[in-house]
Amino acid sequence: MPTLIHQRVRAAQAGTNPYVICRMPSGWAVLGDQQFISGYSLLLSDPIVPDLNHLEEKSRLQFLRDMTLIGDALLAVTDAFRINYEILGNDAPALHAHIFPRYMNEPERRRKYPVWTAYSKEERDSRPFELSKDKELMERIAHMIKQKL
């Protein structure tokens, strides 16, 4: 059953996905639909597989390396002090990783917990992706990633 991840990967392959930061060896680095935490990104596996365990070891390691390269880039171009990584796939069974920069200006009571539980849905939906606002950050992230590839 095709998921939003499938749709986004197809759009990235076609060059029509505005969220794309850059192509990586294991997939696509993209900015998240919601930017309530600036720099929230994802890595979408290409080719699409249901989960990490469906990849051969070499591809699995490449996906994890690419995921951390996105985190390294976020640390370099934002004021984040830490990166949270999540690979869930429960709602959309297609391999993708959520990459959340965490900032010291977040209230401590939120900073200590996963984003999904620390913020309400209304808060998470409060700042949608806007290419005109987010393009510069996407370019800086892409530049840092490409330096390490």
For the regions a language model picked out, list residue spans one by one:
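HIT superfamily nucleotide-processing domains
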Residues: M1-L149
